[in-house]
UniProtKB/Swiss-Prot annotation:
Requisite cofactors: Fe-coproporphyrin III
Name of encoding gene: chdC
Details of cofactor binding: Fe-coproporphyrin III acts both as a substrate and a redox cofactor.
Protein name, UniProt field: Coproheme decarboxylase
Record's function text: Involved in coproporphyrin-dependent heme b biosynthesis. Catalyzes the decarboxylation of Fe-coproporphyrin III (coproheme) to heme b (protoheme IX), the last step of the pathway. The reaction occurs in a stepwise manner with a three-propionate intermediate.
Intrachain S-S bonds: none
Pathway membership, UniProt: Porphyrin-containing compound metabolism; protoheme biosynthesis
Species per Swiss-Prot/TrEMBL record: Listeria welshimeri serovar 6b (strain ATCC 35897 / DSM 20650 / CCUG 15529 / CIP 8149 / NCTC 11857 / SLCC 5334 / V8)
Domain of life: Bacteria
Active site, per annotation: Y147
Keywords: Heme, Heme biosynthesis, Iron, Metal-binding, Oxidoreductase
């Protein structure tokens, strides 16, 4: 049997995509709308406290197209903590007007294809560079791109039948492309084998949305993607600071 990849695991992630029920929202009187927005604001203030003490992260983006209107991206140190955030959000009055369209569960991961190289032989969980990857600070970039992906198991193109050294080489070469976009694109990889329908959830952040097109295009021509990758739907959006939520919902 081929050697399975080992991973270092950090924060658990929830991408929660919602569509706004504008027809129902318009039926509310302004006073009720304001009460709901105030309740949402208090919820987000509590989320900010968690972020400030280093126990999690979160961000909100406005999604383009008809797949969703918003994504709430939350990171926590356990599935229980993540579920608590999800349940509390669903109990907000405004949640009745934010209809779920898609979600994705994963855990920030770094594989031993890369982790041992980054840690340089020390305990990787004590390495600052590794910890920054596993427990990332979400950048306030203008744009987000999220997509799920898996590795193929199709005849001769079966990633999981490749020897470890060949997989390491392919991932290393693939990673060189990503590193060439340092400073332009920040990437968070969430492992989701056994958690969701695909094997990874990829989240990209950038101040220039065209960088998403460039990096994904370049990676498509790399063997690790061209031969062995399968992709789900792509979601792209614009940063929505919490202080701008009221403006979004104002009729």
């Amino acid at each position: 049997m081929n050697e399975a990849v080992k991973t270092l695991d950090g924060w658990f992630c929830l991408h929660d995509f919602r569509s706004i029920d504008w027809a129902a929202w318009r039926e509310l009187n302004p006073a009720n709308q304001e009460l709901m927005l105030n309740e949402l604001s208090h919820f987000l203030s509590d989320m900010e406290i968690t972020k400030n003490i280093g126990e999690g992260e979160h961000t909100i983006y406005s999604i383009l197209g008809q797949k969703a209107d918003l994504v709430f991206f939350t990171l926590r140190d356990s599935l229980e903590a993540l579920n608590e955030v999800e349940n509390r959000f669903n109990k907000l009055a405004i949640a009745d007007y934010l209809l779920p369209t898609y979600s994705y569960i994963s855990v920030v991961e770094l594989s031993n294809y890369l982790a041992s190289h980054m840690a340089g032989g020390e305990d990787p969980y004590q390495n600052k560079g590794v910890r920054a990857r596993l427990y990332p600070a979400l950048p306030p970039k203008k744009h987000i791109c999220f997509y799920p992906m898996s590795k193929k198991r199709d005849g001769a193109d079966n990633w999981y039948m490749l020897p470890m050294d060949e997989r390491q080489k392919l991932i290393r070469d693939h990673g060189l492309i990503g590193r060439s976009y340092a400073g332009k694109v920040q990437q968070i990889i969430g492992g989701s084998i056994g958690f969701d329908d695909y094997e990874w959830g990829v989240t990209l952040f950038s101040d220039d949305a065209l960088e998403f097109k460039r990096i994904v295009t370049e990676m498509r021509f790399d063997e690790a993607s061209a031969r062995y990758a399968e992709f789900g739907s792509f979601f792209i959006g614009n940063l929505l600071p919490s202080e701008n939520l009221s403006k979004l919902f104002t009729m």
